[in-house]
Amino acid sequence: MISRNRRRNNQQKNIEKEKQLETIINKEVKENKDSMKEDKLVVTEESNGDVTTAKEQSNNINLQKNDLVKEVMNIQNQTLNTVVTENKVEIEEIVKKYIPSYNTDSLIVKKLTEIQESSAKTYNTLFRLFTPVKSYLYDINGEKKLSTRWYWKLLKDDLPAGDYSVRQFFLSLYLNVLEEMPDYIMLRDMAVDNPYSAEAGKIVDGKSKEILIELYQDQMTEGYIRRYMSELRHKISGETNTAKYPAILHPVDNELNQYFLEHQLIQPLTTRNIAELIPTQLYHDPNYVFNIDAAFLTNSRFVPPYLTQDRIGLHDGFESIWDSKTHADYVSARRFIPDLTELVDAEKQIKEMAAHLQLEAITVQVESQFLAGISAAAANEAFKFIIGSVLSTRTIAVEFITSNYMSLASCMYLMTIMPSEIFLRESLVAMQLAIINTLIYPALGLAQMHYQAGEVRTPFELAEMQVANRSIRQWLHHCNTLQFGRQITEGIIHLRFTNDIMTGRIVNLFSTMLVALSSQPFATYPLDYKRSVQRALQLLSNRTAQIADLTRLIVYNYTTLSACIVMNMHLVGTLTVERIQATSLTSLMMLISNKTVIPEPSSLFSYFSSNINFLTNYNEQIDNVVAEIMAAYRLNLYQQKMLMLVTRFVSKLYIFDAPKIPPDQMYRLRNRLRNIPVERRRADVFRIIMNNRDLIEKTSERICQGVLLSYTPMPLTYVEDVGLTNVINDTNSFQIINIEEIEKTGDYSAITNALLRDTPIILKGAIPYVTNSSVIDVLSKVDTTVFASIVKDRDISKLKPIKFIINSDSSEYYLVHNNKWTPTTTTAVYKARSQQFDIQHSVSMLESNLFFVVYNDLFKYIKTTTVLPINAVSYDGARIMQET
């Protein structure tokens, strides 16, 4: 109601604005007319005056009128724009709700192109988890000194928000590695000049150069370090065709990059590799000639596409996902189906048909009414619909008017070439029942068929047993038994039309059936209507040759484009269907000419690369989520992370709307993913991270190895690179309790007993902590209350220790310094010291082949020429369009 009232108010405001504009215009037009009359009188009275002045006045009046019209137009446009912008959301909602033709095809195309753009990756730097950071040193009283020291720190040292844990930190760290894991490493391409090299040497990448510059500019860097930096340079071996580049890396980063260098995904590239990428069927197609002019040297490399077949089985049990995928395939395929050209003129064809029939006035009127929807656009729509629906294995439905016998005859042709398994069951039954009760049974003098709901057999299967006419019964038998063939080409299942349909011979059966049907008596129909139906059927049978050519054209374009499909084709019913008007089928049959159209080579390779990119991304995301499931299971996060993992996987496939997928399908997807083995590289990377888990924990500024609890306040200790802090790195003389044992047993008596005996204890285990530099918080000793709730609620996950730092950079530091206070605390963070950065021990020599060149988008090196469309031949060696 609110939206309606708002709409009414806006409409009333707009009407009032328009009325005001009209009154203003009328007044100004009247004034202009009066002024024109006065000017005319002046001109007539002063006939001997200057004529040029009168012309200038009239020109000025015309200019004023034009300006006035422009102003009015601008005002109207502005008001229209304001109305549209104010109600834009409401307009979109109404369009989406009530207009069936509203779709998001442009959005699907955009997402498919995003996959294409993300497939080509370039790597300019090495993979890194750590970076050296400069840290200032502090005096024993907490004052900053000019001295500095360098430590290794994590590049991405962030814990997940909310109910976080260290295990989730390692899972997010592993996911970061999976996202940035390189397919290949070309050291020669990413190498940069060492600005301090004495011999114009190079180092491995820009990040190493940044570290050198920061280290060199540090005034505390000693001379022997600067001399060492000037000696860093690459080494080339001409005998082995390799180059070694110095890289400044943390030991874990060095291990990861060495692994990536040894397990690159690139392969040698030759013209043979490119030729093998072309589908065999296209390569041997006589209508296309492929030339590869580029010559590739022995150092050429490429990343092969990841074309493993569907390991999940989206067609089996994932109705929502399968529907989205097939619709995206349908939208994508329609872009590459050629447009029909030089069709017969629609108006001319309708006139010729009416003249040929020579019917009475009432019959001609009925005919023209039935033929009114024939157009070239509708014919093109039907052509793309038939090919696109089979390419994408979409379920189809035909919309028709039962009394329109021309449409029903067109539907008969569609069922002649399209198996019943691709039709929506309800649409198929309605269409067959209309054909039987409107054409077949009245022609043969049989009673109307009464089809019962829930009948397993189709109307055609029931009619086949009752029809005695041989030609009609053979056609019904063909429709009832027609199925797509399944052909396996290079491990991919493709749907294929039968040989009779591919050669167009099936149209002879269709034509014979039409002739037999038109020669029947139609005893129950009036004479005029009977003659109209008979001549319409004869009109279609007269175009047998053109319809046969049309069939060959459809099959050739489909078969050629289907060679570019790289995923198995499964004909499974979809939730939504693609719909076609029967009038469009009539347009296609009546307007088809002898002009042959075949897919352009650029369209073929665009369609091929689009399918390759989708399947490659699909397999990559499967490997990622399987590795993530394995990592979550190993880190004991399996239960709480599962649904989120699967949802993120679906969203990364671009064309699926993850929130709209029912939960039962998501859990079924989880079960399928659990049974897929982990890819080798991803498993090895996880092993490397877990083997260095302690080292990563020490480097992190968010994770400590435990916490010290004491009933008696203890003074803060002095650490050289921090100042005064409550951090200990030695467990001697302290009682140690394992946090994991407390979580398993739930026995908190050891903590309470130790605190009551005034014995400091260390709860050992990796836990997150926060840092606080406020002096007031330390002096108030509020940290004791943090652990009271832990013992009370018996929940160790609430353990969040605070690391206090007090130095000259802290707030209120001079409050402590001037009053000579000694800050104390009852808790201390147990944390190992971070690894100190030493450039002499952090330089690794990475070796790579010297002159590798990686090529992307290999299809651009293929030059394709085609024969003239009129000379194009089908797979039987004959021309596609034989009636030329």
UniProtKB/Swiss-Prot annotation:
Transmembrane regions listed in the UniProt entry: none
A Pfam match: Rota_VP2
Signal peptide: none
Localization annotation: Virion
Primary site of residence: virion
Keywords (A to Z) from UniProt: Capsid protein, Inner capsid protein, RNA-binding, T=2 icosahedral capsid protein, Virion
Superkingdom, taxonomy of origin: Viruses
GO cellular component, one term: viral nucleocapsid
MF terms in GO: RNA binding
Reported function: Inner capsid protein that self-assembles to form an icosahedral capsid with a T=2 symmetry, which consists of 120 copies of VP2, with channels at each of its five-fold vertices. This capsid constitutes the innermost concentric layer of the viral mature particle. It encapsidates the polymerase VP1, the capping enzyme VP3 and the genomic dsRNA, thereby defining the core.
Similarity comment: family membership: Belongs to the rotavirus VP2 family.
Assembly mode: Homodecamer; each decamer is made up of two conformers of VP2, called VP2A and VP2B. Interacts with a VP1-VP3 complex. Interacts with the intermediate capsid protein VP6. Interacts with NSP5. Interacts (via N-terminus) with NSP2.
Protein name (record): Inner capsid protein VP2
